[in-house]
């Protein structure tokens, strides 16, 4: 699969920190933000399993996935190796949980989160996550 980078938006909507109201994520405000972003011609959203205390993927389902056609936006999320408590089985558990949380059906991009020297990289190697991710791509 090749990606035509000329068609990619120049600005992504990061979901690591989101507006809150009374200690909860503010869905109404997020919907306004998503609408303004989409209306400006942008469509790339980036989230991760642990963002906003694990609630980012679920709220983007309500603010984006349930409100816009799936082919109108690009969604990226990430596999956190350090949260794969059960090892190899954790890859699929987390991936499937992310599909459920987002309701997206598929991810346009799926990243191995925080691949760096040390424990994270070693964990990705130990649990064969690089090959696993390539198979998911197919």
Please tell me what each predicted stretch does.
Residues 17, 67-70, 78, 101, ...:
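Basic side chains
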Residues 9-12, 80, 138:
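Residue-level detector of intrinsically disordered/flexible regions characterized by low predicted structural confidence
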Residues 16-28, 78-90, 118-122:
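Active-site mouth loops of central-metabolism enzymes
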Residues 1-73, 132:
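N-terminal binding-site loop/beta-alpha segment at the start of enzyme catalytic domains
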Residues 18, 50, 81, 104, ...:
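Flexible cofactor-recognition loop at the NAD(P)H-binding site
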Residues 41-46, 75-77, 105-110:
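Short C-terminal domain-edge/linker segments immediately following a structured domain
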Residues 35, 85-138:
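Glycine/proline-rich, positively charged
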Residues 71-83, 110-113:
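A short, structured active-site edge motif that brings together acidic residues
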């Amino acid at each position: 699969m090749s990606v035509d980078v000329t068609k990619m938006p120049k600005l992504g909507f990061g979901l690591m920190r989101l507006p809150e109201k009374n200690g909860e994520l503010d869905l109404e405000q997020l919907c306004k933000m998503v609408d303004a972003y989409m209306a400006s011609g942008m469509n790339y959203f980036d989230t991760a399993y642990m963002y906003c205390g694990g609630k980012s993927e679920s709220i983007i389902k309500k603010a984006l996935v349930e409100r816009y056609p799936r082919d109108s936006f690009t969604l990226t999320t990430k596999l956190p190796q350090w949260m794969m408590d059960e090892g190899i089985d954790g890859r699929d558990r987390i991936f499937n949980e992310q599909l459920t949380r987002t309701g997206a059906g598929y991810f346009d991009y799926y990243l191995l989160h925080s691949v760096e020297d040390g424990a994270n990289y070693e964990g990705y190697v130990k649990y064969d996550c690089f090959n696993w991710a390539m198979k998911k791509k197919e």
